[in-house]
């Protein structure tokens, strides 16, 4: 059964419009809208961020630029896997998404895509991604990919997200998994440097996502999601943001000696953006503690810049 449901196009008199002229234009527009809806289910911006960490990890593992074929396979497989996880997340969370203002325009709550079709789409993407990596890389990379999809959707989305304030922490492993997958695809094993990069992305997710939860606190509360900023005190939220921000920066610096020959090309930019990241984290928490108006999305965006610079430095250092 096709995942794309065609809608009849009629003229004002109620008669069917021919496949040419205005009817054909309308059909093309409908098709583009359907395709756009399926793409939206994959959350492309999240996919992009995951790939930012995957390629540098592969380059560090290889000690330079891996073969273009291997990079293409991992990028395609990784994109499909991340897309699959997001689609299945949208399917499981469709009851929540229709309650939250931030998400009610997503394809499922907006009824642009039928839930059954979204489920099939997500399962197909997951199957293709794992198969691709199993055939063209190795069992470890494929196994990690499958584990990440299952953990994200069945453990985090369906269970932990709805039941514990530590949901962001326990879900962090999924966001950091692409680092391990990329490394494993190159070497077939996981070195200490791979785990260090994993740690950077893992710890980074708390000071990245807590500000987002602060901004949409009322939205999460309306949906009954126990995000830490929704149910905990300002003091508790501030403490976790600062602890994990410091852990992120410290682990990124520990990665310097653990990396295979990484030098100041990695270390200096990482140190500079780490200081800025910590300054922004402390600024947000200080204002929140004083009861002043805060701009949590400032830290959210800075954290994205921080991670991008760190992994760009990993890639550049591996090349030189």
From Swiss-Prot:
Pfam families: UbiA (PF01040). It is a multi-pass membrane protein. It catalyses: heme b + (2E,6E)-farnesyl diphosphate + H2O = Fe(II)-heme o + diphosphate. Gene3D superfamilies: UbiA prenyltransferase. Its main location: membrane. It comes from the Bacteria. Keywords: Cell membrane, Heme biosynthesis, Membrane, Transferase, Transmembrane, Transmembrane helix. Carbon 2 of the heme B porphyrin ring is defined according to the Fischer nomenclature. Belongs to the UbiA prenyltransferase family. Protoheme IX farnesyltransferase subfamily. This is Protoheme IX farnesyltransferase. It comes from Salinispora tropica (strain ATCC BAA-916 / DSM 44818 / JCM 13857 / NBRC 105044 / CNB-440). The lineage of its organism: Bacteria, Bacillati, Actinomycetota, Actinomycetes, Micromonosporales. The gene is ctaB.
């Amino acid at each position: 059964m096709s995942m794309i449901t065609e809608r009849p196009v009629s003229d004002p008199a109620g008669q069917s419009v021919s496949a040419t002229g205005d009817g054909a234009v309308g059909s093309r527009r409908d098709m583009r809208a359907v395709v756009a809806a399926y793409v939206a289910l994959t959350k492309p911006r999240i996919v992009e961020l995951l790939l930012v960490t995957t390629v540098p990890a592969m380059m560090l593992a290889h000690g330079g630029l891996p073969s273009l074929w291997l990079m293409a396979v991992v990028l395609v497989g990784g994109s499909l896997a991340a897309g699959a996880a997001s689609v299945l997340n949208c399917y499981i969370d469709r009851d929540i998404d229709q309650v939250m203002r931030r998400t009610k325009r997503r394809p499922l709550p907006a009824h642009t895509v039928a839930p059954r079709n979204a489920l099939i789409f997500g399962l197909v993407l997951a199957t293709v991604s794992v198969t691709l990596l199993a055939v063209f890389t190795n069992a470890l990379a494929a196994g990690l990919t499958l584990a990440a999809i299952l953990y994200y959707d069945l453990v985090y989305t369906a269970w932990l997200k709805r039941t514990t304030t530590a949901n962001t922490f326990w879900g962090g492993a999924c966001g950091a998994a692409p680092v391990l997958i990329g490394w494993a695809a190159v070497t077939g094993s996981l070195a200490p440097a791979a785990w260090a990069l994993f740690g950077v992305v893992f710890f980074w997710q708390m000071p990245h996502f807590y500000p987002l939860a602060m901004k949409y606190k009322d939205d999460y509360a309306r949906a009954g999601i126990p995000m830490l900023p929704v149910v905990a005190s300002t003091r508790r939220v501030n403490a976790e943001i600062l602890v994990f921000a410091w852990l992120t920066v410290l682990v990124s610096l520990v990665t310097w000696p653990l990396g295979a020959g990484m030098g100041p090309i990695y270390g200096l930019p990482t140190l500079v953006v780490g200081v800025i990241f910590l300054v922004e984290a402390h600024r947000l928490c200080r204002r929140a503690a004083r009861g002043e108006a805060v701009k949590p999305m400032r830290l959210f965006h800075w954290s994205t810049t921080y991670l991008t610079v760190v992994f760009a430095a990993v890639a550049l250092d591996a090349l030189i």
